[in-house]
């Protein structure tokens, strides 16, 4: 096994240990779907009774991370608490919000985004039409959400808001359908590190303001959680 692949395998194991801890603490549960493209079962992670809440937020992480952690870069630095998704599950439950974290890299790391879109569509289909949907995308997950929502205008009417955490976007973007969502109901988080961060570049590409935090790319989900909770609290009566 190559050193790079061995590294990712070990990081995957750490992510699985984080999930196991969350399951044992009963702050998260697994929900299983079948990927009809390959005939295999995969899990998503949900907060208890997530689909019964007035707001159901879908968290989309980056590449090649597995559900349970936001950043393998931080894991390599033994910064597990800053990378863990556990605070999100605790805070969303405390505020009576549902949270679903998809796991698009479950079978293999997916840099193209096909499994991201597939899993997003499955979760959205499971959310009742009287519920509002929140979208949270970090890194590649932010790009996936921008492109997914742009080509899914029927879903836009159900969106309570879009949170983009240091999203890594393409330079060429179509934004016609989501322009109103971007202007009125989008929270953009940007890292402040050396050079131009993904969030700073996204602010220019999307033509929307940003909320900046000092620190590295992988630190942003942990640093932004209070801002994100406040953002959704303002959008759900």
Residue ranges and their predicted role:
Residues 2-52:
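N-terminal cap/lid segment of alpha/beta-hydrolase-fold proteins
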Residues 34-104:
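Short, surface-exposed "cap/lid" segments of acyl-processing enzymes
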Residues 83-88, 94, 102-133:
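Alpha/beta-hydrolase active-site loop
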Residues 63-65, 106-107, 140, 168-170:
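Conserved beta-strand elements of beta-rich interaction domains across eukaryotes
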Residues 147-151:
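Active-site signature of alpha/beta-hydrolase-fold catalytic machinery across serine-
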Residues 54-57, 132-134, 161:
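Structural motif
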Residues 153-237:
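The feature captures the conserved acid-bearing segment of alpha/beta-hydrolase catalytic domains
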Residues 135-146:
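Gly/Ala-rich beta-loop-alpha elbow adjacent to hydrolase catalytic centers
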